[in-house]
């Protein structure tokens, strides 16, 4: 069976066609600048040159039509006809409280995703457009929604409830939701597999460190707490997002600096975090270069990053009443040993012993153990594979 995985952004679309018998990606691609001048599709197939198509794409339906044409293209495709696609798995950012697992698409599901637009105004609308476009072009193919928020729906009330007037929860659904759930679930299951244990036996802290950052306490295979909150702005410092700050800073900036609410939102989401502290950028390769030149602000940003991750690991070890393993994943988690060493140094008291040589290795493979053999808490670097997780969840429903 082959599953097509679709991830729609506001003007972009990522896709993978996965053969579920081998769990290999037959093709993967990115469509950029949808609805903007200069639309472009880039498709990669192992062992072949990149296939690039530049043509006007007025909307996501045009983009998905081009994706399907590219997959069945005589010279550049990987399948003979669309009939070979057994199902389509769609990444949907926000499922609210309604969905704790993936679901087959129907009218009721679509209404519920639309109802969550106010909770994810930037992400859910393009997700909906992508589903509708696929339904139009592939009317007989089952569609499945895989929600970023679903994995965290196992959090207890004491973890997800904010100490605000209770009616904000009952009337406006203001609570912690958490994000990156598909990634956290994948690596929590993968580390159990690598350790030859069942996920239900492990207390794990998963650290998804990319441009967005979230850390999750996974107890017995279930999320019991996570750092992102009502929105993906909460938690630790990120590429350009501030993470947790004193909420009164918001009213201070509005009153004292004369900013509008939208301007403050822009500052906290796009001008803060590692970018704001370092003044260098959000790409960690640039931060690393600046650190090499002894840029004090770049060093400070990295120190803050490592310190906040360390605090969170300690907090979640306390919340779970123990810790068996820590997993680092995503772009920075997989490729920034200088962040990992800052996050792990000082955790010896809970049983973490880092092997510095392994930590500096670039050969991650399916999973790299970076703690010493004697370490009570095992620390791994595991590449995330959200697309494969979405495909697995899709296959389970069709």
From Swiss-Prot:
<feature type="binding site">
    <location>
        <begin position="331"/>
        <end position="335"/>
    </location>
    <ligand>
        <name>ATP</name>
    </ligand>
</feature>
<feature type="binding site">
    <location>
        <position position="14"/>
    </location>
    <ligand>
        <name>ATP</name>
    </ligand>
</feature>
<dbReference type="InterPro" id="IPR043129">
    <property type="entry name" value="ATPase_NBD"/>
</dbReference>
<comment type="pathway">
    <text>Metabolic intermediate biosynthesis; acetyl-CoA biosynthesis; acetyl-CoA from acetate: step 1/2.</text>
</comment>
<keyword id="KW-0479">Metal-binding</keyword>
<dbReference type="GO" id="GO:0005524">
    <property type="term" value="F:ATP binding"/>
</dbReference>
<dbReference type="InterPro" id="IPR023865">
    <property type="entry name" value="Aliphatic_acid_kinase_CS"/>
</dbReference>
<comment type="similarity">
    <text>Belongs to the acetokinase family.</text>
</comment>
<keyword id="KW-0418">Kinase</keyword>
<dbReference type="GO" id="GO:0005737">
    <property type="term" value="C:cytoplasm"/>
</dbReference>
<comment type="subunit">
    <text>Homodimer.</text>
</comment>
<keyword id="KW-0460">Magnesium</keyword>
<dbReference type="GO" id="GO:0006083">
    <property type="term" value="P:acetate metabolic process"/>
</dbReference>
<dbReference type="GO" id="GO:0000287">
    <property type="term" value="F:magnesium ion binding"/>
</dbReference>
<feature type="active site" description="Proton donor/acceptor">
    <location>
        <position position="148"/>
    </location>
</feature>
<feature type="binding site">
    <location>
        <position position="7"/>
    </location>
    <ligand>
        <name>Mg(2+)</name>
    </ligand>
</feature>
<dbReference type="GO" id="GO:0006085">
    <property type="term" value="P:acetyl-CoA biosynthetic process"/>
</dbReference>
<feature type="binding site">
    <location>
        <position position="91"/>
    </location>
    <ligand>
        <name>substrate</name>
    </ligand>
</feature>
<feature type="site" description="Transition state stabilizer">
    <location>
        <position position="180"/>
    </location>
</feature>
<keyword id="KW-0547">Nucleotide-binding</keyword>
<dbReference type="InterPro" id="IPR004372">
    <property type="entry name" value="Ac/propionate_kinase"/>
</dbReference>
<dbReference type="GO" id="GO:0008776">
    <property type="term" value="F:acetate kinase activity"/>
</dbReference>
<feature type="binding site">
    <location>
        <position position="386"/>
    </location>
    <ligand>
        <name>Mg(2+)</name>
    </ligand>
</feature>
<dbReference type="Pfam" id="PF00871">
    <property type="entry name" value="Acetate_kinase"/>
</dbReference>
<feature type="binding site">
    <location>
        <begin position="208"/>
        <end position="212"/>
    </location>
    <ligand>
        <name>ATP</name>
    </ligand>
</feature>
<dbReference type="InterPro" id="IPR000890">
    <property type="entry name" value="Aliphatic_acid_kin_short-chain"/>
</dbReference>
<protein>
    <recommendedName>
        <fullName>Acetate kinase</fullName>
        <ecNumber>2.7.2.1</ecNumber>
    </recommendedName>
</protein>
<feature type="site" description="Transition state stabilizer">
    <location>
        <position position="241"/>
    </location>
</feature>
<keyword id="KW-0808">Transferase</keyword>
<keyword id="KW-0963">Cytoplasm</keyword>
<feature type="binding site">
    <location>
        <begin position="283"/>
        <end position="285"/>
    </location>
    <ligand>
        <name>ATP</name>
    </ligand>
</feature>
<keyword id="KW-0067">ATP-binding</keyword>
<comment type="function">
    <text>Catalyzes the formation of acetyl phosphate from acetate and ATP. Can also catalyze the reverse reaction.</text>
</comment>
């Amino acid at each position: 069976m082959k599953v097509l995985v679709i991830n729609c952004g506001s003007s972009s679309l990522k896709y993978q066609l996965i053969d579920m018998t081998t769990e290999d990606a037959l093709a993967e691609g990115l469509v950029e600048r949808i609805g903007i001048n200069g639309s472009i599709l880039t498709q990669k197939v192992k062992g072949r040159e990149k296939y690039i198509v530049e043509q006007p794409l007025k909307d996501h339906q045009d983009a998905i039509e081009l994706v399907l044409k590219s997959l069945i293209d005589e010279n550049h495709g990987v399948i003979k006809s669309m009939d070979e696609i057994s199902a389509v798995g769609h990444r949907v950012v926000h499922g609210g409280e309604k969905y704790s697992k993936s679901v087959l698409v129907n009218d009721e599901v679509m209404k519920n995703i639309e109802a969550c637009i106010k909770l994810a105004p930037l992400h859910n609308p393009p997700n909906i457009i992508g589903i509708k476009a696929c339904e139009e072009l592939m009317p007989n193919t089952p569609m499945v929604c895989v929600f970023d928020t679903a994995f965290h729906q196992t959090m207890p009330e004491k973890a997800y409830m904010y100490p605000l007037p209770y009616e904000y929860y009952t009337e406006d659904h203001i609570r912690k939701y958490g994000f990156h759930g598909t990634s956290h679930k994948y690596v929590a299951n993968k580390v159990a597999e690598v350790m030859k244990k069942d996920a239900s036996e492990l207390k794990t802290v998963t650290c998804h460190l990319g441009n967005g950052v979230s850390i999750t306490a996974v107890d017995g295979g279930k999320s019991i707490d996570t750092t992102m909150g009502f929105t993906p702005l909460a938690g630790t410092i990120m590429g350009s997002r501030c993470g947790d700050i004193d909420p009164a800073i918001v009213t201070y900036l509005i009153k004292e600096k004369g900013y509008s609410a939208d301007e403050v939102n822009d500052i906290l989401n796009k001008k803060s975090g590692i970018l704001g502290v370092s003044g260098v950028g959000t790409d960690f390769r640039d931060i690393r270069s600046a650190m090499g030149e002894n840029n004090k602000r770049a060093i400070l940003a990295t120190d803050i990053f490592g310190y906040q991750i360390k605090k969170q690991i300690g907090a979640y070890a306390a919340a779970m009443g123990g810790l068996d393993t820590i997993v680092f994943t995503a772009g920075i988690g997989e490729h920034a040993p200088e962040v990992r060493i800052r996050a792990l140094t000082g955790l010896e008291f809970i049983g973490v012993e880092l092997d510095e040589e392994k930590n500096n290795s670039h050969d991650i493979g399916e999973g790299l153990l970076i703690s010493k053999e004697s370490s009570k808490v095992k620390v791994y670097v595991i590449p995330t594979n959200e697309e494969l997780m979405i495909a697995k969840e899709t296959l389970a429903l069709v």
